Swiss-Prot record:
PANTHER family: DNA ADENINE METHYLASE. InterPro entries: Ade_MeTrfase_dom_2 (IPR023095), M_m6A_EcoRV (IPR012263), MeTrfase_D12 (IPR012327), SAM-dependent_MTases_sf (IPR029063). Its EC number is 2.1.1.72. NCBIfam families: dam (TIGR00571). Keywords: DNA-binding, Methyltransferase, Restriction system, S-adenosyl-L-methionine, Transferase. It catalyses: a 2'-deoxyadenosine in DNA + S-adenosyl-L-methionine = an N(6)-methyl-2'-deoxyadenosine in DNA + S-adenosyl-L-homocysteine + H(+). This is Type II methyltransferase M1.MboI. One of its GO terms (molecular function) is S-adenosyl-L-methionine binding. GO terms for biological process: DNA restriction-modification system; methylation; mismatch repair. Belongs to the N(4)/N(6)-methyltransferase family. This seems to be a stronger methylase than M2.MboI. S-adenosyl-L-methionine binds at W7, K11, D61, D198.
């Protein structure tokens, strides 16, 4: 299985590093995985495929439109596939970008009205994700998706087999939409829990925060609240892994995360990405992985 959408900050490239740091119990006893910031779901979908002892999954995101897609994939995969295939058929008949533009912007307007049923809203979400510029999901302050059309000749909107496989695997999943702390009310009593936390990254430059994934900002105060949440997880006896940007990439004296997570293990790993829009100035960057090692 693979993520059904493109997602900025997706964790496919970090999966190897995450796997290396998983606690031993995930390979030997039944457990629950909790993702309070599920996003594109790369970690959860990998775990559902590759960790047979995963017995329950709890996923959450503050982006209600995204969570609706997960709910529809879980409950109505065939209807969703049919709706997207219909969008695909109409889009493919439009032979060039200029002819595709009116269709794209009409569907974007329909999505932003949010008056369609859940299946259609989910289908439009995936359509826009696959046809908009660079797979970005960005909304303005009024929660209006505002990414322009991308220059794709023949994008594929839906992988039927992948959606059906994900749907089967999501049947024992609790799907939530709201604040990240919401997940604590939905933990099982009979399994140990592993939390993977992938919050909106703290910007490492003034231009790095170009993307808004929801209409809720995630500033330094939110990062501090998340650190307190991690302390709460630790006191409850659960294991957590958290990923974030490393401020030291651009300011070697920035101790923000080192101070925030001083009670836990902080590791710096090389990310599979670069910073600077100038190709001559691109350089590899580090990310941090924080864990508690319960």
């Amino acid at each position: 299985m693979k993520p059904f959408i493109k997602w900025a900050g997706g964790k496919n490239s970090l999966l190897d590093e995450i796997q290396k740091r998983l606690p031993d119990f995930v390979h030997s006893q039944d457990f629950c995985l909790v993702e309070p910031f599920v996003g594109g779901g790369a970690v959860s979908l990998w775990a559902l495929s590759d960790l047979p002892h995963l017995k329950q999954l709890v996923i959450n995101d503050c982006n209600a439109d995204l969570i609706n897609v997960y709910q529809v994939i879980k409950n109505n995969p065939d209807d969703l596939i049919g709706y997207i295939e219909n969008l695909q058929s109409h889009y493919d008949k439009l032979t060039d970008l200029e002819s595709k533009k009116p269709y794209f912007y009409h569907k974007r307007d329909v999505f932003n009205q949010r008056t369609s049923n859940d299946i259609e809203q989910a289908g439009l979400f995936i359509f826009l994700n696959k046809s908009a510029f660079n797979g970005l999901y960005r909304v303005n302050k009024n929660n209006q998706f505002n990414v322009p059309i991308g220059n794709y000749k023949k994008p594929t909107f839906v992988d039927k087999e992948n959606i059906l496989n994900i749907s089967k695997k999501l049947q024992n999943t609790k799907i939530l939409s709201g604040d990240f702390e919401l997940v604590l009310a939905h933990l099982p009593n009979n399994f140990p829990c592993l939390f993977y936390l992938d919050p909106p990254y703290r910007p490492i430059s003034d231009t790095a925060s170009f993307t808004s994934y929801s209409d809720n900002g995630f500033d330094d105060n939110e990062q501090k609240r998340l650190a307190n949440f991690c302390k709460k997880i630790d006191k409850l006896g659960h294991y957590f892994l958290l990923s974030n940007s490393d401020p030291k990439n651009t300011n070697s004296s920035d101790e923000f995360f080192d101070e925030l997570y001083q009670d836990f293990k902080i590791e710096r790993i090389q990310a599979n990405r670069t910073i600077s829009a100038n190709s001559n100035g691109r350089k590899k960057v580090n990310e941090i992985i924080v864990s508690n090692g319960v």
